[in-house]
């Protein structure tokens, strides 16, 4: 009767190592690194800014969970899960201001666009990719600058005062020009008046001159007195009518 052959020790060891290698390779098959820009990204207040992020090695990230949040309280800036943007989980200050650019998501590359940048957006952002239970992330720094950061306070004061000074100078020059022209016209009219003066003017009766001067002055005054008396009588009549019929 032939005896059964037993497996040798080297063959068992090789099988064990091969099985271990398969397990290790399968466990590390889904691992990747998340890479973001090394230098801070700069943006001006009111502009748009784009925060790029990718995984290495590149792979299709359509089925992954991708998002941005802000430390230290993990406020959700934008979240992409199950192939859709989860707008309901955004922090209130970012609702309606973010957009995930997914043109290259098949290569593991995405970009977050933030519209209407505010000073409060300055600081750190964290981009993460999650594939099942495995997650990696990268930090991104955003610097927000004022469009007039190059202007010193003294220049701002000068820019505010300069238009007023220019307006005053312009008005003054216009006034001087008009005054000079009016003086010339007045001088010419006086000279013409002296040339065309009629000595018979003094023979006009004094009552006509008085009437010509007083009527334009007293006319409006008399009309005002008449209107006042009419209004006074009307109000007095209404008051008496109310006294007679109180209800």
From Swiss-Prot:
A biological process term (GO) from this entry: T cell receptor signaling pathway
PROSITE patterns: IG_LIKE (PS50835)
SUPFAM superfamilies in alphabetical order: Immunoglobulin
Glycosylation sites per record: 60
Signal peptide location: 1-29
Regions crossing the membrane: 155-175, 211-231
Positions on the Cytoplasmic side per record topology: 176-210
The keyword Cell inner membrane is assigned to this record: no
Subunit description: Homodimer.
Function: Minor component of the myelin sheath. May be involved in completion and/or maintenance of the myelin sheath and in cell-cell communication. Mediates homophilic cell-cell adhesion.
Name by which UniProt lists this protein: Myelin-oligodendrocyte glycoprotein
